[in-house]
Amino acid sequence: MPLYEHVFLARQDASTQQVEELTTQMTGIVEGLGGKVTKTENWGVRSLTYRMNKNRKAHFVLLNIDAPSAAIAEIERQERISEDVIRYLSVRVEELEEGPSAMMRKADRDRERDDRGGGFRGERDGGGFRGDRGDRGDRGPRRPRDEETADEE
C-alpha cells in the first residue's frame, strides 16, 4: 500500500480534546478502509505565517499513514466538511520517517536551549555611544574638496 504523510491544521479556538477527537476520527476512517496510522504527532498550537480564515494560530497534527488512496480521499473529504480544520496536506512518500519528525526534534532542541541558563549576562561595558574611534592611520590625508564640483551639484 502507498505511504502518506498527512498534516492538518485545526482552529486555534478548538480545544485539545476536540483536536484529539478529530485525530481519532481520521484514524478510524483510515482503519475502516483497510489502512493503518503508523504515527501520530500533535505539534501543538503554533503561529501561522499569515492569517487563514481569520486565524493567526492553529493546532498542527501529523499522521503517518499506510493506506490505499481511497482512504486519503475520504480523510480529505471529511476535513473539507469539518469547520474545525483550516488546512490539510497529504503527501505520498517512498518511506515513512522513523522516530520523531523534524518539528518535534526542533521543539526538543528549543527546550534544551531554554535550559542553558540564558537571561542576565552580568554587567557590561559600553553599550550605546562608543565614542570617537580616533584617526585611522592606514589612510592618507584627505583630498581637498573641489569647490567647482560642489557648486555644480
Curated annotation (Swiss-Prot):
GO terms for biological process: translation. One of its GO terms (cellular component) is cytosolic small ribosomal subunit. The lineage of its organism: Bacteria, Pseudomonadati, Pseudomonadota, Alphaproteobacteria, Hyphomicrobiales. GO terms for molecular function: small ribosomal subunit rRNA binding; structural constituent of ribosome. Belongs to the bacterial ribosomal protein bS6 family. NCBIfam families: S6. Residues 105-147 have a biased composition (Basic and acidic residues). CDD domains: bS6. Signal peptide: none annotated. Keywords: Ribonucleoprotein, Ribosomal protein, RNA-binding, rRNA-binding. Binds together with bS18 to 16S ribosomal RNA. Residues 97-153 are annotated as: Disordered. PANTHER family: MITOCHONDRIAL 28S RIBOSOMAL PROTEIN S6, SMALL RIBOSOMAL SUBUNIT PROTEIN BS6M. It comes from Bradyrhizobium sp. (strain ORS 278). This is Small ribosomal subunit protein bS6.
